[in-house]
Amino acid sequence: MKKKLIIFSSIAIISIILFIILAAIVNNDITVPLKIDTSVRDFFYDIRGNKGDFLYYFNRILTELASKYAVIIIGIIIIILTKLDNKAISYAIGALLMILINYVLKDIYQRERPVEALRWIIETDYSFPSGHATSSGFMFMFLAYFLYDSNYKKVIKIIGYVLCGILVIFVPMTRLIFGVHYITDIVGGLLNGIFAASISIILMIIFKEFKIFDKPILVSLYEYIKRDKQEGNKGPEGEEKSE
């Protein structure tokens, strides 16, 4: 337990420090994109092809894997798999933290998105940090640890790790292809997502060690309802009521 806590606490601290440094650089002149932002933006504009071709529709699907709906769906799946145990509780806390951080930071920095004429999709909120990148960093890091801490077969875990590794890179990249974010928005979002995932994993480790929410809440609720129903069917002396 101690080793894991040190590892993920370190990851959380490092991600915060790196974000603070990045945010300071971006905020130095929030109205002017950095050179790396314009260079990466122009690169993706050159390779993305035309709106309406295969790459466009493929990325429309891919980008939804980090939408708010995806965060909710993953949460529901985790609840179903765990029957609402400490893993599901940890995910919910991390997801709420992620949403709060992203909302507050966007409002603080108020960075405008890239040129509207070159965007492939409509986005109305601020640019820094990227919400989709934040969701990607959070979900795919959490899911990787969820697999690590599970009893699934090794081959399933390996496939899951590979998929998480691929998606955490390519899903945020769709935001560059659509022209709605700069690369620094993406990096900032990933750092925030990694921080939120680290907090979730730390909570999961602590909950598991001290047996907090150890018994799935849905199982406990079912047993309580069943027991209450059985007691309700008994008479005053503990005998079953006759129909």
Predicted regions and their residues:
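Alpha-helical transmembrane segments of integral membrane proteins
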Residues: I6-I11, N86-G94, I156-L163
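Short juxtamembrane and helix-loop transition motifs at transmembrane-helix boundaries
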Residues: N50-L62, G94, M98, W120-T124, ...
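N-terminal transmembrane-helix/juxtamembrane module of multi-pass inner/ER membrane proteins
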Residues: M1-K68, I108-W120
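Aromatic-anchored segments of alpha-helical transmembrane domains
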Residues: F19-I21, M98-L105, I166-R175
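Interfacial segments of alpha-helical transmembrane regions
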Residues: I72-L100
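Alpha-helical membrane-inserting segments
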Residues: L18, L22, I101, L105, ...
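Membrane-embedded catalytic cores of phosphoryl/pyrophosphoryl-handling enzymes
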Residues: R119-E243
